[in-house]
């Protein structure tokens, strides 16, 4: 089989073709003892890591479509706001105490504080802050076969290391945006290429793919050649890790932050002459084989920047600080409440149906902390009915444990619905049925939440979200407004160090 043919194969076709060819060769592939299922074959394709590195090294800013640049600005602005707000999260003070214990000395900005640190530790703390509230952007999946319809959080692993290195080097806004887009594109296409097994078996995609994105962004800012960029990917892959069991705990954002730190360190070590496997993506004992079992090389050989992930299938910006799988239901619930003027004291019960994948991920059915509430469909429905809003102030322990909130949570029945299941993982359908005490039933359904490519937020919408994040962080209004305007015209900024004073207390 020729290398170029692999890029055109689906998982099913790839499995069938490889098993047939190996059987013809007398390898005995597909003959598994004791009735066990034969694992999917692993593509024998060389040069994948090299191709990704070439994309990072050779892509010019002018190659990025203008609409992709503008979409990226929204995610960058959102990321800055969440970095500020994340220092007020429960994990924020702990991370700062941890930073103190490291005795880190450096000039890199720890956003939302008066502190500075060495670049790699600033990247760690800033990344944890962005992901702390689970309020950051998400990558949609391009294929129905991919589990859960979304793949990873693209900005949290990439923006912090890219920003601290741009700050260190005095890079321009254009240079930062190019590095950011390359990092996001690499991590998202790696996530897209992996077999669903990686996520299904418990790997946290943002944590295992994020180091590649961080390394890609920093490699471009450091102007590494192809060889050293390949080495950086080898280091990043070997340092990657993260598990879904940590969802709903502080360790979920720590996994993402650790990946940002590791991606930065990988580039610095590669620059200094460190060695690593230079074919880590496709190697027999490499990244894809270890975490996913198999993958589709076409996403990395043919589809980097063709189209850009921001262009298709798109990146969603969250209007609510909860798991993305809650957002279609939250968007529909908010619309139903407004349309029918539903009051909490009128509600007898709420029924929410979703797919098996959604139900298994939103596993906090009896939440008692703000973190648990982020992965609780029951809480998300309850708080909208009680307060008609669900922002950062609502996802706090004290709010979750209020008697009226707990009582409303018990009225919400969340379950697997056959119609939602049949819609497919790419739709994330939620079906809502509100029964009032009068007997009236109000119902609706939605497959896409506000902020998704199907229902996008404008730059001004994201600016309003940023203002809310800044207010939650008690950030000076004048600084917040200046950040909004600087990001709006980021490509005209000659030196990213102009942002330092605005993001540091």
Short names for language-model regions:
Residues 1-14:
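N-terminal secretory signal peptides and thylakoid transit peptides that target proteins
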Residues 66-67, 90-92, 274-282, 339-350, ...:
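Flexible, glycine/charged-enriched surface loops at secondary-structure junctions
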Residues 9-10, 432, 462-463, 469, ...:
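Conserved acidic/glycine
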Residues 9, 26-313, 496, 502-505:
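N-terminal core-entry segment
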Residues 19-22:
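C-terminal segment of classical bacterial N-terminal signal peptides
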Residues 323-474:
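Intrinsically disordered, low-complexity Ser/Thr/Pro/Gly-rich interaction regions
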Residues 12, 256, 265-276, 293, ...:
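Short, well-ordered loop/turn and helix-capping segments at boundaries between secondary-structure elements
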Residues 312-321, 325:
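Glycine-rich phosphate/diphosphate-binding loops and the adjacent beta-loop-alpha structural elements
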């Amino acid at each position: 089989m020729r290398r170029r043919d692999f890029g055109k194969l689906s998982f099913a076709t790839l499995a069938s073709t490889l098993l047939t060819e190996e059987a013809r060769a007398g390898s005995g592939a597909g003959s598994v003892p004791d009735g066990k299922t034969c694992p999917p074959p692993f593509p024998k394709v060389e040069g994948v890591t090299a191709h990704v590195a070439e994309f990072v090294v050779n892509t010019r800013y002018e190659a990025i479509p203008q609409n992709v640049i503008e979409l990226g600005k929204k995610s960058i602005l959102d990321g800055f706001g969440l970095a500020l707000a994340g220092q007020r999260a429960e994990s924020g003070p702990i991370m700062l105490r941890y930073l103190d214990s490291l005795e880190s000395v450096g000039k890199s900005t720890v956003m939302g504080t008066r502190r500075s640190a060495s670049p790699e530790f600033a990247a760690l703390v800033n990344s944890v802050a962005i992901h702390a509230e689970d309020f950051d952007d998400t990558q949609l999946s391009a294929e129905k076969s991919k589990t859960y319809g979304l793949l990873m959080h693209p900005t949290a692993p990439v923006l912090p290391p890219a920003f601290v290195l741009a700050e260190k080097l005095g890079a321009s806004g254009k240079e930062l945006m190019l590095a950011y887009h390359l990092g996001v594109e690499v991590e998202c296409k790696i996530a897209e290429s992996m077999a669903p097994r990686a996520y299904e078996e418990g790997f946290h995609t943002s944590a295992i793919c994020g180091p590649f994105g961080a390394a890609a962004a920093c490699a471009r800012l450091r102007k590494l050649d192809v060889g050293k960029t390949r080495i950086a990917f080898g280091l990043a892959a070997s340092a990657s890790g993260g598990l879904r069991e940590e969802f709903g705990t502080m360790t979920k954002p720590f996994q993402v932050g650790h990946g940002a730190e590791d991606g930065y360190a990988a580039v610095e070590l590669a620059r200094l002459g460190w060695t690593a496997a230079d074919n880590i993506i496709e190697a027999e004992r490499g990244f894809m084989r270890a975490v996913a079992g198999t993958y589709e090389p076409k996403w990395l050989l043919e589809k980097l920047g063709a189209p850009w992930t921001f262009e298709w299938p798109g990146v969603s910006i969250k209007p609510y600080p909860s798991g993305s799988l809650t957002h279609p239901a939250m968007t529909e619930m908010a619309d139903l409440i407004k349309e029918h003027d539903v009051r909490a004291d009128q509600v007898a019960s709420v029924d929410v149906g979703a797919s098996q994948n959604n139900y298994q991920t939103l596993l906090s059915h009896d939440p008692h902390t703000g973190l648990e509430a982020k992965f609780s469909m029951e809480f998300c429905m309850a708080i909208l009915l009680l307060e008609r809003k669900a922002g950062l102030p609502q996802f706090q322990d004290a709010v979750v444990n209020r008697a009226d909130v707990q009582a409303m949570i018990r009225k919400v029945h969340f379950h697997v619905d056959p119609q939602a299941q049949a819609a497919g993982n790419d739709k994330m359908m939620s079906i809502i049925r509100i029964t009032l005490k009068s007997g009236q039933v109000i119902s609706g359904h939605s497959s896409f939440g506000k902020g998704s490519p199907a229902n996008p937020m404008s730059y001004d919408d994201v600016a309003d979200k940023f203002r809310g994040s800044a207010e939650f962080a008690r950030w000076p209004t004048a600084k917040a407004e200046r950040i909004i305007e600087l990001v709006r015209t980021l490509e005209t900024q000659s030196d990213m160090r102009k942002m330092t004073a605005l993001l540091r207390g």
